[in-house]
Swiss-Prot record:
Binding, substrate: H172, K176, E210, D229, K334, K339
Reactions this protein catalyses: D-glucose 6-phosphate + NADP(+) = 6-phospho-D-glucono-1,5-lactone + NADPH + H(+)
PANTHER family: GLUCOSE-6-PHOSPHATE 1-DEHYDROGENASE, GLUCOSE-6-PHOSPHATE 1-DEHYDROGENASE G6PD
Residues the entry annotates as binding NADP(+): R48, D86, F87, K142
Name recorded for this polypeptide: Glucose-6-phosphate 1-dehydrogenase
Organism for this UniProt entry: Borreliella burgdorferi (strain ATCC 35210 / DSM 4680 / CIP 102532 / B31) (Borrelia burgdorferi)
GO molecular function annotation: glucose-6-phosphate dehydrogenase activity; NADP binding
Gene Ontology CC terms, in alphabetical order: cytosol
Highest taxon, organism lineage: Bacteria
Length: 478
């Protein structure tokens, strides 16, 4: 298949001197350039730091240093220009306009705090965007609001300047190879799609665990928590991909429609039952490999009485024909034993087995490993070599790095290229955002009485999460 590529465009990065830009966006753009996926483009950096173009390029080069490609980096840096500006000042946007080529497509990337989304979009719309509207796109990072109401306000703001097919709401988890492969694995292999339902699936477990705590980000995080920070976007996006019906064709519009149907089918949890479905946790200080790690409340003085969850485990159900009665266990947390993300699908045990004397668990499992090692694993049973008829569990593994020579090492590479090409399949739509916020906001309005369970920094999380499991179900080890 011919390599996807695009040329003749400008990308304006608002907040270009921030961490996201330096660590993710610029290296991803360089790799796309190195692999000849983009050409004849310009990166227009917009920020409040004072730089000449030369100083800006040296600043960018620090995040790209690779000895074997040094000459290529020098060529790449020639595509960069810098515009000094304040996100709230109209003169800054008038100055930016002078740098734009009205004959080329312009992608506006908002690598900023959400607090600046309003000023940036309003200034773009007011001063010059309307003159080249059809040649513009906008890419923005989460959070997409802090509630259903604010998400709707953000969507209204975006629609005042852009059409839906010009808006790209990025969720980097959707750019990971294993996540993308859920779609192909299901609908491209009949042996799996035929058992992808409540007749065969016992439960589904989605885990997004982070090893690091909130170092330096507690003031922002304390107003958000794990429910809004992780469940509303990453985890519900993964759930919708696993649970969706087959679209009538491989097209972004139809794929998004099926994902929305799943989100709208999530069963609301009553206030009376919420304690049986959700466990909230918060990490406390602990020794980790000989180093003391502070607890969440120890990060700053003002957190002394905080009940913000740094860990969340929950059980949800989907009210449709395919998944009725199948629990989906969702969990995410910070300050855990390791960085680890996966989707685990446990299949039901056969109603009858020939091997009643064996202690082996005869339920099979399918695992999508998202990080740290991208891959897919199938757990099955086999005869152990030897004179006796012993059965043991074995794993059949597929590794991306072992099977393919070239990978997108960074999810942003694929997502950026898709945006440049106008492919919104791996981006979230307004309907998805609002549907997920509707579910999450309903929980947030009901769970005030749930107590926070403490867990040690560097552990697996609070032990109380076992209380929400159905009979014979279990949590995977982190």
């Amino acid at each position: 298949m011919k390599e996807r590529s695009v040329s003749n465009f400008d990308i304006v990065i608002f907040g270009v001197t921030g961490n996201l830009s330096r660590k993710k966006l610029i290296p991803s753009l360089f790799n796309l350039f190195k692999n000849k996926c983009i050409s004849n483009f310009r990166v227009i950096g917009f920020s409040r730091k004072i730089f000449t173009d030369k100083e800006f390029r040296l600043y960018i080069k620090d995040s790209l240093w690779q000895e074997e490609t040094d000459s290529l980096i020098e060529i790449f840096l020639n595509f960069f220009v810098y515009v000094f500006g304040d996100f709230n000042e109209k003169e800054s946007y008038k100055n930016l306009f002078k740098f734009l080529d009205r004959s080329r497509e312009t992608i506006y990337y908002l690598s900023t705090s959400p607090a600046f989304y309003g000023p940036i979009i309003n200034h773009l719309k007011k001063y010059f965007l309307s003159e080249k509207l059809t040649l513009s796109k906008i890419v923005l990072e989460k959070p997409f609001g802090s509630s259903l109401e604010t998400a709707k306000k953000l969507n209204s703001l975006l629609y005042s300047a852009f059409k839906e097919d010009q808006i790209y709401r990025i969720d980097h988890y959707l750019g990971k190879e294993t996540v993308q492969n859920i779609f192909t694995f299901r609908f491209g292999n009949s042996i799996f799609e035929n058992i992808w339902n409540n007749r065969y699936v016992d439960f589904v477990q989605i885990t997004v665990a982070e090893e690091l705590g909130l170092d330096g980000r507690v003031e922002y995080y304390d107003s958000v928590g794990a429910l809004k920070d992780m469940v509303q976007n990453h985890i519900l996006q993964l759930l919708s991909l696993v649970a969706m019906e087959s679209p009538i064709k491989f097209d972004s519009e139809f794929i998004h429609d099926e994902k929305v149907k799943v989100l709208k089918s999530l069963r609301k949890i009553s206030k009376e039952d919420i304690k049986n479905y959700i466990v909230k946790g918060q990490y406390i200080g602990s020794q980790v490999q000989g180093v003391f790690k502070k607890g969440y409340k120890d990060e700053t003085e003002f957190l002394g009485n905080s009940n913000t969850e740094t860990y969340l485990a929950m059980k949800v159900f989907i009210n449709n024909w395919r998944w009725s009665g199948v629990p989906f266990y969702l969990r995410t947390g910070k300050g855990l034993a390791r960085k680890f993300s996966e989707i685990y699908i446990q299949f039901k045990k056969p109603s009858f087995t020939l091997f009643n004397n064996s202690s082996v668990d005869f339920s099979n499992a399918l695992i999508f490993r998202i990080q740290p090692r991208d891959g897919i694993e199938i757990k099955f049973n086999t005869k152990k070599p030897g004179y006796n008829y012993e059965i043991q569990t074995a794993n059949m593994e597929f590794s991306y790095h072992g099977a393919f020579k070239r990978l997108f090492d960074e999810a942003y590479e694929r997502l950026l290229l898709d945006a440049f090409l106008g492919d919104g399949t791996l981006y979230a739509t307004s309907d998805e955002i609002e549907s997920s916020w509707e579910f999450v906001s309903d929980i947030a309005n009901k769970w005030a009485d749930i107590e926070i369970c403490n867990y040690f920094y560097g552990s697996e999380g609070p032990k109380e999460i076992d209380s929400i499991l159905e009979k014979d179900h279990f949590w995977r080890k982190i």
